[in-house]
Structure formats: structure tokens, C-alpha cells
Amino acid sequence: MTDYKATLNLPDTAFPMKAGLPQREPQILQRWDSIGLYGKLREIGKDRPKFVLHDGPPYANGTIHIGHALNKILKDMILRSKTLSGFDAPYVPGWDCHGLPIEHKVEVTYGKNLGADKTRELCRAYATEQIEGQKSEFIRLGVLGEWDNPYKTMNFKNEAGEIRALAEIVKGGFVFKGLKPVNWCFDCGSALAEAEVEYEDKKSSTIDVAFPVADDAKLAEAFGLASLSKPAAIVIWTTTPWTIPANQALNVHPEFTYALVDVGDRLLVLAEEMVEACLARYELQGSVIATTTGSALELINFRHPFYDRLSPVYLADYVELGAGTGIVHSAPAYGVDDFVTCKAYGMVNDDILNPVQSNGVYAPSLEFFGGQFIFKANDSIIDKLSEVGSLLHTETIKHSYMHCWRHKTPLIYRATAQWFIGMDKEPTSGDTLRVRSLKAIEDTQFVPAWGQARLHSMIANRPDWCISRQRNWGVPIPFFLNKESGELHPRTVELMEEVAQRVELEGIEAWFKMDAAELLGDEAPQYDKISDTLDVWFDSGTTHWHVLRGSHPMGHETGPRADLYLEGSDQHRGWFHSSLLTGCAIDNHAPYRELLTHGFTVDETGRKMSKSLKNVIEPKKINDTLGADIMRLWVASTDYSGEIAVSDQILARSADAYRRIRNTARFLLSNLTGFNPATDILPAEDMLALDRWAVDRTLLLQRELQENYGEYRFWNVYSKIHNFCVQELGGFYLDIIKDRQYTTGANSKARRSAQTALYHISEALVRWIAPILAFTADELWEYLPGERNESVMLNTWYEGLTELPADFELGREYWEGVMAVKVAVNKELEVQRAAKAVGGNLQAEVTLFAEAGLTADLAKLSNELRFVLITSTASLAPFAQAPADAVATEVPGLKLKVVKSAFPKCARCWHCREDVGVNPEHPEICGRCVDNISGAGEVRHYA
């Protein structure tokens, strides 16, 4: 038997079938570094329009988790796609470096008695070490960026820039000092930002407490009675017994109805709607003897249960009837609403009782409970209330309660003197910060759209921003306060610039070691130098100032306003939030045009990632076993707007999808053997109809992909590329052209036409996958024929694709119809193979019984219809002539019949043809193959 293998154009490529990503990706990273890829991108982008994605800084502590990887990969995919779209899209990664978590780590390692200077020194060293570790992990993901010059909030220039940003906000009239209840952590010894608060379940003691009336006559009058027949008391309900020693008022709703209830030995004031539930809870019988409105009770005095002082009734709209008694006890030092109400009634700061010290222990001077930790004092307080006859009921409940995000310990509201940025304070000029911010939200694009309402609600309802902290490792608030008036120095903004200049040279240490006289001269004795530091959310929230127009100026056409901020959905109350406030305070607009939020990673059952559940997926493990491109493909394949599921099984599915895409790319490369684009490419008008359709289909898909990349719909990009590879290419086009590729002359028009199409498809595909499969795209790029630059990323979307003319006879709709027919034929061939009626498809002969219109369409392919259907013979017959055993199909007006060919099999092309052996010199092959070997070669027109 003659071996005709040498006469075939068999596929051949050095592009490996096995990706070996864990080993290959580090080599590609080294190559990117050696050619200075990021620098070259900046060089070619000089004259392009700029797209600025500003990096939300991760905290410089610990190794990265899968959520970090997701975030960085999303950013990289956007910037790569923008680069391919013709933008200059730089990426300056950043780190958040100050704050309690790092200070806490240092204290745990070295102890709490280091001294402030040593603490700052060790914190800076620790953050530097952590950044280096995280940086290498981010680079391993294939993220291109300015890794040699990232921004760090602890860089001297950034620290100075933050002080300058604060000066701008001071200049705008937004900053003030005030006594207000703030989130307070005893372990931190400091106020916390809203974004540093987590909610966890906590067990608490609830108590119903009676406050005896002090003004009997006024209470009787309020209820329309001549006098009170018995002792009377008003009843409150609270989940914080420890606040009772600080009670200073009682709040009722002005519009609620309140009842005077006779319970035998005394009269109780309760909200009418709560009487039945309260009496049941107290196990008392009683009857309502009178009712009145809350407003009638205003300013009536009651007595504190165990201290010799009065608690007046104040009106408050925040009182609710969902639980309790309808009366709220007010400790203004430990509740925001309480504080606001008491201040509205004229209570001055000096009158506010605040017996809880910064460590959570009552001041020694507090009668009965001095020196006790507040949560441990609950039992003592309950006992005291019982002793004086004021305790009506107590029980333990489990409820959601605020905790410190770092220590996981319960927080309290605690009134302290702090620095605030006022939401409703009248600024030097223009609207209040709240009004500015709400307007800015309306001018911002949100992806997904629901983020707008969420951020709007948060801004509309948030309190003033407490920006001061009582810690060492933070950017200082460089204020001088007049010892007598408590006012800021009149040259505060000017002095802040002097401090900023020193900090730019020496870091924040410059402020802490500075003597006031250095700046104030003879005035120094009149002023206190403030030791507070700034909230870390102010650090990151002002990066638009100290990075985008400071350490890393972007030179955007419209100023230092980023096109995009992209972070997890928790940043609506974090970085998005703080950046919005500072941007509006300084520039009267948001520092971003668009906000994109992604959800959190969960396992495939929807559970949060937790070491205790053993469902944590570490990025390093994925890199070491599957490769970063598999992780990137997983990110791209998932709708990030909600929770994002990840597990070994899900990643395995991503790996399968990757293999299908890689195999398609390998097939394309292997069939471009011997193809030189400079000499072998055919103009569109010389290509076969099917090849022109394939290029046209590629062009249409490229337009869809560009649109989806532009809208950050990566899951659509992934799906469309995957389907194109598997269905339109693998399931249709590539299958059909194999015969032509392998059997026609190496330099024939039939083969060069297909190779031209494959080349165009390859040039497009390598760019399509580049934002997602960053490593594989550059690997593929090196194997493509023709001269090319060093990386696919140094190019834009492929422009060599041509569109089918509108009047082209075998146009888009035509090939859609042919595909449907091919699907129907394949389905029947599978049935026949399963029944062992035929072996391979090329053993089959198919007859298509079609209605006249379909017959006319299929007849346009002439004798090339068999190549499209990949059968040895394909015949057309009228639909009416279909025999009883013809199979109906899903294609209207089409039945078909498949039989095994009776003709011999060609040893070269494997088609079963009646002319096999007709040529005595080649007794084992068909006439077509003889012509392709030694004759003029077959001529194809369509497929």
C-alpha cells in the first residue's frame, strides 16, 4: 500500500498542546520584564487619549486572598482592553499603609511600651515588608503596572499631599471640632470609621426600668386628672444596662398615644400600643385609667432610679413601637440620637455625663460602679435596679451588634472631642457637603446601576465624618489650638503648608518631633499642638489629590478626575464614600466618572470563604497547579455584580474551557504552516465564499466583543469567544476546511484562501483573548506567522477583517441556513453511527429531500455540498419524493436519508468514491486526489 502522507499538507506547529501554565507563565513574566513591556505601552500611548483607572489601595498587611486576585484581574482586563481600543491606560498600583491593623501587629510582636517614635519606625518597616510580598503575588497574576513605582500612602510625598488635601478642606470651611458620640473601640483606644464597623450577633441583657415621677401634679394634668391616686413611674426598655448611670433624659414620640396604667401598687406610663405586651412581660394585671399624647408629656421631670437627679421628658421622632415600651432612656454621651435630642433642648457639652473611660472602665468617681468594666457591670446595675424597686423585667436576647473589624470585640458610641468634616455645616462658599455629594452621585455612572441608590442612601443619612484618631501610626492633623478660646490658629492653612513641606522631606515623623515654637515663635505658649492622627479612610479617600495630582500625576485631558474606580461592593461605605466626600469638599465634584463594584467570593454552595469551613481557595495554589490564566478565565466567565462562586470544581470547568480555546488556537496555527502573510495572503474578492463568510463572521463578533469589553461585560466576552471556538469554528468552519487544507495543492487558491481566513481569524482571536488570557495570548503571538512586534499588547484590535458585501450571493443568512442543515445531517449521522450502520462520516452518502427554495439554495454549492456536510456524497431530491424511511428534521421543508457508501475508500482523502482506482498509476486513490498530486489540482469555488 502506497503511503500518501508526504503528499498531504498535514497540520504542524511547535505551539504546545499542553499549556504547562504554572511553569510557562513565570517565563513570560520574565520576558515582559526584560523587554520593558509596561514602559513600551506608556511610550506608544503618549499621543493617545488617556483612560485612568485609579487603584483603590489594598491594606499592606498579609498575603493576598482570592478577592484581591479577582479585583486586580478585573482591573487588568479593563486596562488591557482599553489599550487594545487605542487608549493610553496606565496602571499605578497603590497601598494603604497607615492605621490600626499595622500598629496592632507591631504591638503584638514588640509589646505596647515601645514609645511613639519607635512604633512608627517599626510600622513603616512592617508595611514595606508586606507590600513587597503582596506585590510579587499581584505581578504573578499577570497584572501589568508601574510596580517599580507604586503609590504608598506612607510615602513622604503622599503623606504631605494628604496634609495639603486637609488644608483645602479646612480652607473650604468644612472642618470643625466637636463633642459627639463616635464609634469607639476599647482595644483600639480610638474612634473608628463607619467602614471599620462590622455587625455580629451578641447576647445582651434587656431591662425594663421604672423612673419615678418627680412632678406629680404636672403628670396628672397631662393625663387630664385632678391628681395621682398612687405613686407613678415612666417605664423605659433598653439593651444597654451599662448606660443607665449616664441617663439624663427620657424620650417620647410627640404623636404617639401614651397610657397611664394602674397595676395595683402604682401607676405606669407606657405607650398605649405596648401596654398589653408590657404587662404580659411583667406578669402584671392592670387597666388604663387615662391617655394622652407624647407632646403633653414634654419636660415633665422623673427621678433617676438610684442617683439624686432628674430626667426630663424630651420629644423625639426616632422613638419607635417595634419593641420595648415606647419610651427611650437617653444617655447623650452614648447615643447619636440621644445626643442630638439633648443638644436640641439646650444641653451644653459640659453638662453631658460621660463616666466611661477610653478603656471601657467606669471612672473611679462613679458612685456604685466606679472601676468596673461596663459590660461586666451590667449585672451590678441590674441588681441595683432590683434593690431600689425599679426593675420590672430582665432577660437575655441575641441581636446584631456593632463590633470592631480588627479586634472582633463589641463597640460602643462614646462622646469624645474629635475633629469632624461637617455634612451640613455651611462652608466658606457654595452648597453643603451633603448637597454637593448627592449632586455628584447623580452625575456618576454606576456598574451595576443599583450602586447609585445605595451610595445615595448612605450619603443622605450619614452623620458628620469623624476624621481624628488617637493613634501613633497615622498622618497627623497638624493643628494648633488656642488654649483660651479653643479656636484654630488664624494662619492654620499657611502653617499646614509649612508642615507639609517638612513632611515631604522627612515623613510624618517631622510633625511629631517638631516643637511648636519652630512654627509659631513667640505665640507658641498660647497654643496646644494637636497629637491626633487622621482616619485611614482619609488617607485613601484623598488619593485623587495626593496621587492623581501629586505623586503620580495622570495628565488627564479633563484634570485629575479618574474615569473609573473599581472595588468590592463594601466600598460604597468605604473608599468610594470617603473619596466622594473629599472630592466634593475640595473640587465640588466626585473624583471619578464611573464606579464599578463587584461582589464577594463564595464557594459553590454560596457560603463565605472561611478557614474553619475549609473552603478557602488561595491564589497561590491556583497559580501553582492550574496557572494564572485559568484564574483569569474564571474571573472573566463570572457575572461579578453579585456573589462570585469559586471552588476546585468551578476552576476545573474553567480549565476545560481554556483547553478548548487553546486547542482552537493550536489548530489555527498548525494550519498556517508555510503561510507567509507578506506573499500568500489573498484579497477578499479572490477568497472562497465560505472563507469570506468566516472572516465576515469574525468581524461581526469582534464588534460585539469590543462593545462588551467597553461595557465591562467580560462574561459575555468569554461566552462569545468560547462559543465561537467550539461551535462556529470547531463545529462548522474548521471541520469543513480540513479536507481542503490537507488535500489540495500547497500553494493552491483553495488552500491559500482558507489559510488567509485562518490568518485573519488568528490575528483577531489573539487580541480578543489578550485582556483575559494574558499569558496565553502572548505565547500565541510568538507563533503567529509574519513579522510582528514583541507583544500582542503593543497593538490595537485587528483591522484586517473584511465585511461581506450586502449583495453577496452566499451571504450571512445563506450560511446560517447551511449551518442548520449541517446540524440536522450531523444528528442523523450520529444515529447511524450508534446503530453501526456507518463508521465515520465519510463512509456515508446523504440524500436531502428538500422543498424547492431550500433545494435551490443548497444547489448553489454544486458538487461542493458534500465537503460542507463532510460526507462522501451529498445529493438533492424533491421533498415530495422522500421515501417513508426518510428522517424528518428541525429544518422546515427538509428530510434526509443516510446510507453507507458502496464505493471504495480513497487511501489519501478517505472519501468513498466510485473513481477510486481508475488511474492505474494510483490504484488506491480517487480522481480528485490524483489531480491534486500530479495534475492541475482541483478547483474550489465555495467551500
Curated annotation (Swiss-Prot):
Catalytic activity: tRNA(Ile) + L-isoleucine + ATP = L-isoleucyl-tRNA(Ile) + AMP + diphosphate
Cellular component annotations (GO), alphabetically ordered: cytosol
Record motif 'KMSKS' region, residues: 608-612
Motif ('HIGH' region): 58-68
Sequence positions that bind L-isoleucyl-5'-AMP: E567
Keywords for this protein: Aminoacyl-tRNA synthetase, ATP-binding, Cytoplasm, Ligase, Metal-binding, Nucleotide-binding, Protein biosynthesis, Zinc
GO terms of molecular function: aminoacyl-tRNA deacylase activity; ATP binding; isoleucine-tRNA ligase activity; tRNA binding; zinc ion binding
Residues at which ATP binds: K611
The EC number(s) this enzyme carries: 6.1.1.5
PROSITE patterns xrefs: AA_TRNA_LIGASE_I (PS00178)
InterPro entries: aa-tRNA-synth_I_CS, aa-tRNA-synth_Ia, Anticodon_Ile_BEm, Ile-tRNA-ligase, Ile-tRNA-ligase_type1, Ile-tRNA_ligase, M/V/L/I-tRNA-synth_anticd-bd, Rossmann-like_a/b/a_fold
Pfam families given in the database record: Anticodon_1, tRNA-synt_1, zf-FPG_IleRS
Subunit structure: Monomer.
Name by which UniProt lists this protein: Isoleucine--tRNA ligase
Organism ancestry: Bacteria, Pseudomonadati, Pseudomonadota, Gammaproteobacteria, Pseudomonadales
